[in-house]
Curated annotation (Swiss-Prot):
Listed Gene3D superfamilies: Winged helix-like DNA-binding domain superfamily/Winged helix DNA-binding domain
Protein name: UPF0502 protein PSPTO_2686
Domain of life, per lineage: Bacteria
Pfam families reported for this sequence: DUF480
Family affiliation: Belongs to the UPF0502 family.
PANTHER family reported for this sequence: UPF0502 PROTEIN YCEH (PTHR38768:SF1)
Length: 221
């Protein structure tokens, strides 16, 4: 399937970005940690590397080095998407996606989820965003996704054989990386075909707890 957007070009948009996979992961992590762990945000370089390499709530799982993350942070800073915050003990990094891409908070959260976990259904996005933004229902999620699509920052992926729902994916990455990610997700069985929404939510909550434990353990190593 060819990944295209029917949006009228605006500035800034996905065509002007085409971030690499490391940059995509960094922005997704900064958005996530700002929403879920505000007490430790902005993040130090070490904390950001740990977040990037989490084994849960990430698709794909990555193994980035401090050098790779640091280089990508500087590249993102040059595009106005991250900012270095100087500190007395350690320097920290924050994202500027809201200003850099002119997004409202709900759109920032959805973009972060799409950056971290690839193509997802509306139901998945609604469940996974519950700790980060208060969407009243799936219609609110769809409304914000449609605004991202209109900006050329996301696209609708029609359901494939064996799938019950359409999916949405971001268009901020390199086109070849996006094609590979989409192909992998289309070949994988749909998660939760026989699971209830409550069961899916419990699984996502468990993943969040595991991710928090992984982060604590990594800091002790």
């Amino acid at each position: 399937m060819s990944i295209e957007s029917s949006a009228t070009p605006t500035t800034p948009n996905a065509e002007a970005l085409q971030l690499n996979s490391t940059e995509v992961r960094i922005l997704g992590c900064l958005i996530e940690k700002q929403a879920t762990n505000p007490e430790t945000y902005p993040l130090t370089l070490n904390a950001l590397v740990i977040a990037c390499n989490q084994k849960t709530s990430r698709d794909p799982v990555m193994n980035l080095t401090q050098g790779q993350v640091g280089q990508s942070l500087r590249a993102l800073e040059g595009r106005g998407l991250t900012r270095l915050v100087m500190g007395s003990r350690a320097d920290r990094w924050e994202h500027k996606v809201d200003k850099g891409l002119e997004l409202v908070p709900a759109q920032v959260i959805l973009t972060g989820l799409l950056l971290l976990r690839g193509p997802q259904t509306v139901s998945e996005l609604l469940t996974r965003s519950n700790r980060m933004h208060d969407f009243e229902d799936s219609e609110q999620v769809v409304h914000q996704l449609e605004r991202l699509i209109a900006r050329g920052l996301a696209t609708l992926v029609p359901r494939q054989s064996g799938q019950r729902e359409d999916r949405y994916m971001h268009l901020i990455g390199d086109p070849e990386d996006l094609q590979d990610l989409l192909a992998a997700r289309q070949q994988a069985p749909e998660r939760g075909n026989a699971a209830s929404p409550a069961a899916t939510q419990r699984l996502d909550e468990l993943e969040a707890r595991i991710a928090a434990l992984e982060e604590r353990l990594a800091r002790l190593e």
